[in-house]
Amino acid sequence: MPLVILLGIWSISALNAIPGLAVSPILGQMSTIFPQSSEFDIQLLSSLPSLLTIPFILLSGKLTEHINNIFLLQTGLIIFVLSGLFYMLSTEMWQLIAVSALLGIGSGLIVPLSTGLISRYFTGRYRTRQYGLSSAITNITLVSATMLTGYLADIDWHLPFIVYFFPIVSFVFSLSLIHI
């Protein structure tokens, strides 16, 4: 198996831990940054990506029967990255909430493909091993990205959203999957 394919699949596994992560270290600051916001608005920032991820995981699974998996993956990655950009540019609470919904959509398209690509490219014991590595990468990313977003939140509340640019790496690697 070419290393570029492994790196591509592993990079997608890393993304499973990221949705909603950047908001966590700044939740306590949101009522100060946006004093007109309700507690419900602030809670939506952390819960909306997960709420929308669920139906889009189901939709993505169904779409893989009719649409090229790599195209679907790249669409999800683009939505994910655009979410990061829009978060960085947001100046109003309603914008952050709308972007949270967009992030959930992008994430939902990607999540089933991380394990789906393992099923597609690996068999037997090697497939089982890749599932284990995928899980480990997801958890390592969760810990690392949590530390990074916490550090960045101390500098500026917009900076934790930089983690939503990580899918650019996965997008570049996904280009190698097109020809296989």
Model-derived regions, located:
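Cytoplasmic helix-loop-helix junction between adjacent transmembrane helices
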Residues: 101-136
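Helix-breaking motifs and short loop linkers at transmembrane-helix boundaries and internal kinks
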Residues: 36, 68, 89-94, 123
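Residue-level signature of mid-helix packing/kink "hotspots" within the transmembrane helices
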Residues: 21, 50-58, 142-143
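Helix-loop-helix hairpin linking two adjacent transmembrane segments in secondary transporters
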Residues: 133-176
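Conserved MFS/SLC helix-loop-helix module at the cytosolic interface between two early adjacent transmembrane helices
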Residues: 55-91
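Paired small-residue
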Residues: 83, 94-102
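Extracytoplasmic
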Residues: 5-36
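Conserved small/polar residues in nucleotide/adenosyl-binding loops
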Residues: 178-180
